[in-house]
């Protein structure tokens, strides 16, 4: 969510900015859904259940408070996402992020048989596919506004002359 929200400020055209805004807003609801699932799974655990589940190291640091970290226990950091200010770079990375999220949901579904977890995860997985497609549309929009023979000749968010004819001049 934060990645897309920050990228929207330099995104052009406005349609791409709108896509980034819409998806960043929806991704916040994904965080809420995952947090609700985690809370429901951990609420009321006994010390014995915590130890049995291998959850004791987490419990020592956070009790049952939700703390953003990977499945391996690596804490979340803003270094996980990027905003380069180049829409081709950013949208390509966004598409990869959506595919990684989908793969993570696939792995959760392989390991989980609880329908109260599986059903919302299936929903989130489908939304990641839609986001991937929307970012693909946004990337095509950016590329359509550029010189079709060389998308990489300039940065459309920075170079004011970046357009269909911009790459006829040599880059310095």
Language-model regions: role of each:
Residues 1-172:
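Non-heme di-metal
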């Amino acid at each position: 969510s934060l990645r897309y929200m920050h990228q929207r400020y330099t995104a052009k055209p406005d349609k791409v900015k709108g896509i980034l805004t819409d998806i960043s807003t929806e991704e916040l609801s994904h965080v809420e859904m995952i947090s609700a699932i985690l809370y429901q799974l951990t609420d009321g655990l006994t010390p014995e259940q915590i130890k049995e589940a291998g959850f004791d190291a987490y419990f020592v640091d956070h009790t049952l408070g939700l703390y953003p970290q990977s499945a391996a226990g690596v804490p979340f950091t803003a270094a996980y996402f990027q905003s380069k200010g180049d829409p081709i770079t950013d949208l390509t990375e966004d598409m990869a992020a959506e595919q990684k999220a989908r793969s993570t949901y696939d792995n959760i579904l392989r390991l989980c048989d609880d329908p109260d977890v599986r059903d919302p995860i299936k929903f989130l997985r489908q939304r990641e596919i839609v986001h991937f497609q929307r970012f693909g549309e946004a990337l095509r929009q950016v590329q359509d506004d550029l010189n079709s023979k060389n998308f990489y000749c300039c940065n459309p968010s920075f170079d004011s002359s970046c357009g269909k004819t911009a790459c006829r001049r040599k880059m310095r």
